[in-house]
Amino acid sequence: MMSSKIPVTIVSGFLGAGKTTLINKVLKEKHGEHIAVVINEFGEIGVDHQFVLDVEEEIYQMDNGCLCCTLRTDIADMLKSILMVKEQNGINVDRVLFETTGLADPAPIAQTFINVPFLNEHFILDAVLTVVDSKNFLYQTTHQTEPAKQVGFADKIFMSKHSLVDDTIYAKVINEVRSINPFAEIQDLDARPVEMKDMFGLELFYASEKKILEMQENSEEEYCEACGHT
């Protein structure tokens, strides 16, 4: 069961993977949810905002009732501003969708929600979603480390651009994804339109909280070794 804290969904994916597909689903459709969406930049989304709720932080209310803003400060300050706008305007915020940059490892961002007291008090991680580019993933993983990190930390994986590759290549991509992360659910975005239930209310992150604890332990061990402690 989720607590009274506001659930947070993190969306990751390498450059051009198709995160915008999921974000536009939230910002453009009449789904009845009040979701605060923190994105990289408005230019990639191409949505029309309705009301300016906070000029300084550039927080907008969309036609479907969702809030949208870009990450101009650190995560905690941005979400404090969203909560302030929520209280001042009497707006519901059912959940938060946080888009990482294409080159970001989602693990440190997830750790921030756990380790920063304000965020841990008001928010709870629901799931980390990663979008995988079926056409370019095999090439990307041989030249960059981030795509594998994004897949490895995912609670759920959305495969994009399946229609752009043949079945043999797609099978190789799935095998590679599974070798990196054998536990995450995989959904093909080309098989059917994504629905809100595919993205939210999954309650998957704390089912695998162990990964965060292991990362924290590893970080502490590396610090001790660097300082000459045992």
Protein language model regions, located:
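C-terminal accessory "lid"/substrate-recognition subdomains
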Residues: 156, 165-230
